[in-house]
Amino acid sequence: AIMAVQATATVMGALGFTNHVVAQIIALILVVVLAAGSGILGFEAIMKVQTWITWATAVLTIVYLVLVAPTIDFAVLSSRPSAPLTAVLGAGCMLLVGFGFGWINAAADYSRYLPRAASTKGVVGWTTVGAALPTVILVFFGILLVGSADESLSEAIGGDPIGALTTLLPTWFLIPFALVAILGLIGGIVMDIYSSGLSLLATGVPVSRPVATAIDGTIMTVGTIVVVFFADSFLTPFTAFLTTLGAVIAAWGGVMLADIALRRKDYDEPSLFTPSGRYGSVNWGAVASLIVGSLVGWGLVVNASASWLSWQGYLLGPLGGREGDWAGANIGILLAMVVGFVGYWATSAGRVRAQEKLPSRTYAQGADEGEQ
């Protein structure tokens, strides 16, 4: 939502709209109405919106790549000095959090919309290709563009990533560019708001689905207002958010991967719906692994430009401290996943084996036990 608002306001300015603050307000209202409105309307509306967004985004993205390709200068790129290992690791971990880990918690949300008859291999294969292929192409192309330009483009991207890229475009393509940028971002927002609304309902909050979706949309709006109108730049809160939340998601992902690796049978679905089932209410081994993994992750990342996160990096002493070369490597993200995986395996392997020895039950049995 933040990038969609910034991109819209920047394009409006390029087209002659001189009041940037008013442009941001108009852009915010437009994004919120389109995204939250579609999410509240429900699944059928989302599917119709997503179909058009997908095709429009694909076509306009290809046109954009063709238009800016001449600005790539391989002579300049080859003259760039090589980055140190720690910088490469840091950039790789940020990409991992921003793209790869973003699918860990979203996988179940997107999968819930698929028919039960869908092939497991097909779901995994097409999800992997659909998520990875565009990301690899666009990130690689973006590296070529930024590496070919002077430092002013990199600085501009730190404040407004998508809007900065308009400087490479002819004026006649600004409106189509705005469409591809905004529609692509809104497409993701729509799905995420709808899914997060369902997740909120799963926690037991006694509200209807549209109300739950509206709550999440409100949170999104408040966060967007804070970053767009009060933050010094986009990059500072963005990287702070990625590394801080990324450590938790990485640890949680490690727990999930360990659980998948340990199990030889499918989950007994009726038992998932009752605290008296074989899985119980809480797996304290998983909780402990998540907490310890998160703490290890936070201890090995830093956010130098975000003063409110100065407490992070408390485990970097042996690696040169918060100002050393390894401070920006973000290895805490990787180690958080390792700790989550190893911790869950060590604490829950026996528990999983015991669960799989029990006989399966019917939904009726699960419901009866839940009522008791």
Spell out what each predicted region is.
Residues 1-17, 186-202:
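Hydrophobic transmembrane alpha-helices that form the core helical bundles
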Residues 65-71, 81-145, 169-193, 280-301:
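Hydrophobic, membrane-embedded alpha-helices of multi-pass small-molecule transporters
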Residues 41-54, 105-137, 152-163, 192-211, ...:
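Hydrophobic, small-residue-rich membrane helices and short re-entrant helix-turn-helix hairpins
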